[in-house]
């Protein structure tokens, strides 16, 4: 299985744009051209047809990111192009629709989509990048291949602080406590993946951003994630088995009755990166 990750979205692009400090967390693949948004002269840039940009450049509140002038620089591109935005926790919000006023932008494929537009296509955060311990895709594939029996019902363990966590995770955590779910121990990555694989369902609220690695870890292991309804989860629930929760205070275990047994995994092949890219016609 060619597991989806942020690096892979970057690597299929012909050119990548970010700030120098972003590169530590991005792909180390040197096959494509990397451009420093603060140093490169974008005037009449003879751009390729597929461009990656670090999605933190969308940020409208941090002075250092605003000063980079991301949108103004995209306006200088000479040729039509599709834009892939990934590799940060920042979301694509209603305000970012002004990007579609740039004549040369055809489609935007973005992580953490928080609005809708006919030319805006959500793409998965997938699993973590290879620089992280929890981005060991070879090990994750080995657990997938082992097909560990699902003997437990709902996995319950996550951090509450940081990013989107502070808004939604306390409500999800309170639901887990109210339902008397056994809270799993925090484990090292490899032990965690093997433990997670034993479950049919998993409480999976938002992460640092709107999307979350946990949801995708679940889907790869054929666990049905239980997620708060938002633009991202609602979109991917059309492709994969995901339980959408509108109100954590109203969620109950009986909502899961028959769900795992009737889960439709017919699109599981789309969890392969190459298949997903073909599905999107990138």
Segments and roles (model prediction):
Residues 1-216, 220, 224-243, 255-282:
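Nucleotide-sugar donor-binding catalytic core of glycosyltransferases
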Residues 242-250:
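Short acidic-hydrophobic, aromatic-tinged amphipathic segments that line or gate anion-handling sites
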